[in-house]
């Protein structure tokens, strides 16, 4: 962190207009977050490279590598242990708990702890030896909240005694001599050092300053807090990732095993876990040419609800089109309340049309999303623990799709095929939903309106999505979505989705999309 400086690494508080731009952006900006570029990620990379260095030393036994650290160092200990398989033992200090998860900006990253936390991160190291401790801080309840779960997990491997907790609630936040003795004991036992226990620290002669000084006249320290370095580093990281991801997009294996899992990760919910959905307050009425069913779908698994308006034909074919635009459940109707002609054609041909108010969608139009209250404008403080609104709207599409495809009693018509159409801001939502649901959605018509996550200048924008730009932005979504029949408007370059049908110039997008869906 020398080149970036402590004000950026540890004390960041306010968004920087000069670093918030579509080219040459800085850390904590919407562009950096859309590319999953973070201080925590850089520190974890530094930790991995430190292991690389250690393994070049002839005196290092590669089978006995351990990591330990306290507080923020405890966070890095957990992250390195979770991501680097070369480590044999981990000892995070005053960090693992079910309470506060890491207060510094360097300990947080968007997506990191959504529906998860430090206990689960520590659990990723199982069944390898791991120790931790408690103090009179946020870890003080660990003996009853978190540690028993780790013991149970280790017990599944038959290694319950491979995870230990040193109690020390009478000490403040620390890595004191008593705590260090606990680490020494775990290290001695599992690395078979053969030392007499307990291991007591002894006085030692510190190395002279010249022996432990990194920077000197021959090796001058780099400039600290260098904005040009920061911009250049993030630009290189973006370029390096793009080269690899573009290569992946060219092969079926890359699309299915690189891009699709990444999209599922940033959306935060695979379709297989869409949830148990019911329609308890469905109300159906006959209209001149169709049945109209209204009400709320309730996703019992996640405590979510989606208000829908489902227009069902008299002679259904078993196909339903989920039709999304920025007007929510009013998307099927013109200003006078009549059904849009292209959708009436779908209904007359036996295709159901379902519109919905996705999360926080109303006729007022949301300008900014909610964030966790606090003085520091760090996106990870909100989106490291909560789904972005964009992702939640994709979840709603999954809820609708899951309900439609789940067999049920005869009170609702059987659905054999679900298609999807999205326009306005909902175009990108539809693209993401199609990409994240595999073959559950048979056909998709998407008007992107040229939208790109990487063009957003506000991390509170309703369209903001952590990681949204990293995996080739909206064209990356369309690339994965094109595994099934896909119609696209708003795009001029179809290199990443050559099998898709592109809108012809001059045609109304909704009319053209409806006609394509009928083919």
Language-model features, listed with the residues they occupy:
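Primarily recognizes the serine-hydrolase "nucleophile elbow" in alpha/beta-hydrolase
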Residues: 42, 49-114, 400-477
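Catalytic-domain carbohydrate-binding cleft regions of carbohydrate-active enzymes
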Residues: 64-88, 92-93, 99-107, 111, ...
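Alpha/beta-hydrolase-fold serine-hydrolase catalytic core, especially in secreted/extracellular enzymes
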Residues: 126, 133-321, 327-352, 359-410, ...
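Short beta-to-alpha linker loops that shape the active-site pocket of alpha/beta-hydrolase fold enzymes
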Residues: 1-2, 357-361
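A conserved hydrophobic secondary-structure block that centers on an alpha-helix together
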Residues: 1, 33, 58-61, 66, ...
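Core alpha/beta catalytic barrel or barrel-like domain that forms the active/cofactor pocket
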Residues: 2, 19-22, 26, 90-98
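Alpha/beta-hydrolase active-site loop
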Residues: 6-58, 366-410, 473
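Short, solvent-exposed loop/turn and secondary-structure capping segments
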Residues: 2-12, 78-80, 92, 101-105, ...
């Amino acid at each position: 962190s020398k080149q970036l400086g402590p004000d950026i690494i540890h004390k960041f508080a306010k968004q920087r207009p000069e670093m918030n731009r579509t080219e040459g952006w800085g850390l904590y900006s919407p562009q950096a977050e859309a590319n999953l570029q973070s201080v925590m990620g850089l520190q974890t990379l530094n930790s991995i490279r430190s292991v690389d260095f250690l393994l070049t030393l002839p005196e290092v036994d590669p089978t006995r590598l351990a990591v330990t650290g306290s507080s923020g160092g405890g966070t890095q200990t957990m992250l390195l242990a979770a991501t680097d398989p070369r480590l044999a033992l981990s000892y995070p200090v005053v960090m693992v708990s079910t309470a506060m998860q890491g207060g510094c900006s360097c300990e947080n990253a968007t997506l990191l702890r959504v529906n998860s936390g430090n206990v689960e991160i520590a659990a990723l190291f199982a069944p390898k030896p791991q120790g931790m401790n408690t103090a009179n801080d946020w870890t003080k309840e660990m003996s009853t909240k978190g540690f028993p779960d780790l013991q149970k997990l280790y017990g599944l491997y038959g290694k319950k005694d491979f995870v230990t907790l040193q109690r020390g609630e009478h000490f403040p936040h620390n890595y004191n001599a008593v705590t260090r003795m606990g680490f020494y004991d775990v290290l001695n036992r599992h690395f078979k050092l053969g030392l007499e226990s307990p291991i007591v620290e002894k006085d030692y002669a510190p190395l002279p300053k010249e022996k432990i000084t990194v920077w000197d006249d021959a090796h001058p320290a780099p400039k600290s807090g260098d904005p040009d370095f920061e911009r250049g580093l993030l630009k290189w990281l973006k370029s390096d990732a793009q080269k690899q991801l573009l290569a992946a997009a060219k092969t079926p294996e890359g699309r299915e095993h690189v891009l699709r899992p990444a999209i599922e990760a940033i959306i935060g919910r695979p379709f297989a876990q869409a949830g148990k959905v019911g329609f308890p307050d469905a109300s159906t009425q006959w209209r001149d040419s169709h049945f109209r069913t209204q009400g709320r779908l309730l996703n019992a698994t996640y405590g979510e609800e989606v208000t829908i308006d489902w227009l069902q034909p008299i002679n259904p074919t078993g196909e339903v089109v989920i039709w999304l635009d920025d007007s929510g459940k009013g998307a099927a109707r013109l200003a006078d309340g009549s059904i849009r002609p292209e959708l009436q054609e779908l209904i007359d041909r036996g295709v159901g049309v379902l519109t919905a108010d996705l999360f926080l969608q109303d006729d007022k139009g949301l300008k900014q999303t909610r964030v966790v209250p606090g003085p520091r404008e760090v996106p990870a403080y909100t989106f490291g623990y909560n789904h972005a609104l964009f992702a939640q709207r994709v979840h709603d599409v999954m809820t609708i799709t899951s309900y439609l495809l789940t067999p049920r009693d005869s009170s609702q018509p059987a659905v054999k095929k679900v298609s999807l159409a999205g326009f306005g801001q909902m175009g990108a939502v539809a693209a993401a939903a199609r990409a994240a649901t595999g073959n559950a959605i048979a056909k998709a018509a998407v008007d992107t309106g040229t939208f790109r996550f990487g063009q957003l200048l506000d991390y509170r924008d309703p369209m903001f999505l952590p990681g949204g730009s990293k995996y080739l932005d909206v064209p990356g979504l369309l690339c994965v979505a094109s595994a099934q029949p896909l119609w696209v408007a708003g795009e001029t370059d179809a290199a990443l989705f050559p099998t898709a049908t592109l809108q012809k110039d001059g045609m109304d997008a909704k009319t053209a999309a409806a006609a394509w869906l009928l083919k």
